[in-house]
Amino acid sequence: MLNHYLPVLIFLLVALVVGVAPLLMGSSLGPHRPDSEKLSPYECGFEAFEDARMKFDVRYYLVAILFILFDLEIAFLFPWAVVFDQIGMTGFLAMMLFLAILVVGFIYEWKKGALEWE
């Protein structure tokens, strides 16, 4: 039974070696000669005038999280719709429970004012 998973295990091991081996070789075989010029911040050939990080409003992150949430909802909804005629009432009720939980979460976010930009 586990013989069917042997190609997957070999693939994962080869992928791990291909991904990690160049990193280890570069860090162990490469020259390590840091000086003050190499360690200084560099911005388009000039020293950085100020901190390059800009402050973002937290609401942008909230919108991004809500987008990911509803994008995942669609990712679950499409395969469910494809096999809808084969899964019966149990699959239907499971998806309705999933959608109800998402709707309750959306209503909670709306009532808390997380979607308002005032």
Swiss-Prot record:
| The reaction(s) this protein catalyses | a quinone + NADH + 5 H(+)(in) = a quinol + NAD(+) + 4 H(+)(out)
Which EC number applies? Answer: 7.1.1.-
Coarse class of the primary localization is membrane
**Membrane topology according to the record:** Multi-pass membrane protein
Task: From the record, give the transmembrane residue ranges.
Answer: 6-26, 64-84, 87-107
Identify one Pfam family in the record.
Oxidored_q4
Going by the UniProt record, its keywords in alphabetical order are: Cell inner membrane, Cell membrane, Membrane, NAD, Quinone, Translocase, Transmembrane, Transmembrane helix, Transport, Ubiquinone
Q: Which GO terms describe its molecular function?
A: NADH dehydrogenase (ubiquinone) activity; NADH:ubiquinone reductase (non-electrogenic) activity; quinone binding
Localization of this protein: Cell inner membrane
Entry annotated with the keyword Transport: yes
GO CC annotations?
NADH dehydrogenase complex; plasma membrane
Keyword Transmembrane on entry: yes
The UniProt entry, under InterPro entries, shows: NAD(P)H_OxRDtase_bac/plastid, NADH_UbQ/plastoQ_OxRdtase_su3, NDAH_ubi_oxred_su3_sf
The role this protein plays is: NDH-1 shuttles electrons from NADH, via FMN and iron-sulfur (Fe-S) centers, to quinones in the respiratory chain. The immediate electron acceptor for the enzyme in this species is believed to be ubiquinone. Couples the redox reaction to proton translocation (for every two electrons transferred, four hydrogen ions are translocated across the cytoplasmic membrane), and thus conserves the redox energy in a proton gradient.
Q: Which HAMAP family match?
A: NDH1_NuoA
What the record says about family reads: Belongs to the complex I subunit 3 family.
Instruction: Indicate the quaternary assembly.
Output: NDH-1 is composed of 14 different subunits. Subunits NuoA, H, J, K, L, M, N constitute the membrane sector of the complex.
Protein's recorded name: NADH-quinone oxidoreductase subunit A
Q: Which organism is it from?
A: Acidithiobacillus ferrooxidans (strain ATCC 53993 / BNL-5-31) (Leptospirillum ferrooxidans (ATCC 53993))
- Gene symbol of the encoding locus: nuoA
